[in-house]
Each structure stands twice: as structure tokens, then as C-alpha cells.
A protein has these predicted regions:
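Structural motif
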Residues: 80-81, 95
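Short, positionally conserved secondary-structure boundary motifs
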Residues: 1-73, 138, 145-155
């Protein structure tokens, strides 16, 4: 069974926000930065970047959510990250999704084993959630970006 009817049927709470086309998500852009050897080939600098253009494909269907918890750390999603969720993407196995299971939200990876669908944390010590064990299953959206602060490490 493949879930073709992905839908949302209610308010999500205060942890959700929708970007507007007027929000100031722009800044100075240096075209590239080398993490190895610098490139002398750069002969121009773009004056600005509109983060909406790069991060938001469908503004009407895009939301920001704040992550609480660490079960998705191996996917590069950490506690307090800001996720960009696109509800217009049809979820497939392998996607990180926001799911509503019997009224409770969760962020997990959608996987398929044989004919069953599961939601799985990207940490091994968390059990997979069998979607067939729930009455009300809604895949609310697909996580497309995770924004987090880079912390200083002791060296």
C-alpha cells in the first residue's frame, strides 16, 4: 500500500510559520568559498542573494519548523535546527518527513520494507514506527533543508 493521499487537517501550533515574499532573507554573497585551496579564477562578486530563491521552491506550501530532540542527528538535523518543510513534494521512501500519527507530530525518515511503510529515526537505538499500527496517518510535508548554527569546537 502506498499512501497517495497525503493531507493536513488542522492547526499545527506556534512552532510553525510560513514565509512571506516580503521577508528579508537576503544578504551579501561571495560566489564560492574554498574549503581547500583558494581559486584565483573568481573575477566577479555577486552583490546579493535572495535566500527565498534558493531555499523556497513553493512559497504557498513552505513552512518553517523548529526541531526538538536528537533522533535525526545522523541525518544532519539537530535539536533547535530550523527546518524548511515543503508540503507540495510527494513523499517517497528515503525522504525525511513530518508526520502526524494519531494526533502527534514526529520527524522521521519514510522507509519501505517489503509491503510495509515505516518511519525511522536516523539513530540506531530508536525503533522504527510501523505506519500500519496507527489509525490516523498523515504525512504533512517533506523536510528539504535544515538550518543550524555551526558551533565552535575545542581543538
Amino acid at each position: 500500500m502506498y499512501y497517495n493521499a497525503w493531507y493536513w487537517s488542522g492547526p499545527m501550533g506556534s512552532n510553525r510559520s510560513r514565509p512571506s515574499s516580503t521577508e528579508g532573507l537576503s544578504s551579501l554573497l561571495i560566489p564560492t568559498i574554498s574549503a581547500g585551496f583558494p581559486s584565483p579564477a573568481e573575477d566577479y562578486i555577486e552583490l546579493g542573494i535572495d535566500l527565498n530563491k534558493y531555499l523556497i521552491r513553493n512559497p504557498i506550501s513552505t513552512f518553517f519548523l523548529r526541531v526538538s530532540g536528537n533522533s535525526m542527528n545522523n541525518a544532519g538535523i539537530y535539536n533547535n535546527d530550523l527546518l524548511i518543510i515543503d508540503r507540495s513534494i510527494n513523499p517517497h521512501p528515503g525522504h525525511v518527513v513530518v508526520a502526524l500519527l494519531d494526533g502527534e507530530f514526529t520527524l522521521k525518515r519514510l522507509i519501505k520494507k517489503k509491503d510495509n511503510y515505516y518511519l525511522k529515526a536516523d539513530k540506531e537505538n530508536y525503533p522504527a514506527i510501523n505506519l500500519y499500527e496507527y489509525v490516523d496517518i498523515q504525512i504533512w510535508g517533506v523536510a528539504i533543508y535544515s538550518i543550524h548554527e555551526l558551533k565552535k569546537q575545542k581543538v
